[in-house]
Amino acid sequence: ADTIVAVELDSYPNTDIGDPNYPHISIADENSLHFSFHKFSQNPKDLIL
């Protein structure tokens, strides 16, 4: 499979380039340039699995 997926944990809003104005996880399919954004909590206790 030649699918390339990038995942980014982003807490800085780059609104000038289309980033959401909230902490988020970006998931990008680099071959088709489709992006999805998902909110996340910045509370470390919420990150414990």
Swiss-Prot record:
What this chain does, per the entry, is described as: D-mannose/D-glucose-binding lectin.
**From the Swiss-Prot or TrEMBL record, what is one GO molecular function term?**
D-mannose binding
What quaternary arrangement does the UniProt entry report? Homotetramer.
Q: In which tissues is it expressed?
A: Seed.
Any other noteworthy remark? Binds one manganese (or another transition metal) ion and one calcium ion. The metal ions are essential for the saccharide-binding and cell-agglutinating activities.
Question: Could you tell me which SUPFAM superfamilies the record lists for this protein?
Answer: Concanavalin A-like lectins/glucanases (SSF49899)
- Provide the organism lineage as a comma list: Eukaryota, Viridiplantae, Streptophyta, Embryophyta, Tracheophyta
PROSITE patterns given in the database record: LECTIN_LEGUME_BETA (PS00307)
Q: Which family does it belong to?
A: Belongs to the leguminous lectin family.
- Briefly state the modifications made to the protein after translation: The beta and gamma chains are produced by partial proteolytic processing of the lectin alpha chain by an asparaginyl endopeptidase. Mixture of 60% alpha lectin and 40% of its beta and gamma proteolytic fragments.
Q: What is this protein called?
A: Lectin alpha chain
Keyword annotations of the record:
Calcium, Lectin, Manganese, Mannose-binding
Tell me the InterPro entries matching this sequence: ConA-like_dom_sf, Lectin_legB_Mn/Ca_BS, Leguminous_Lectin_Domain_sf
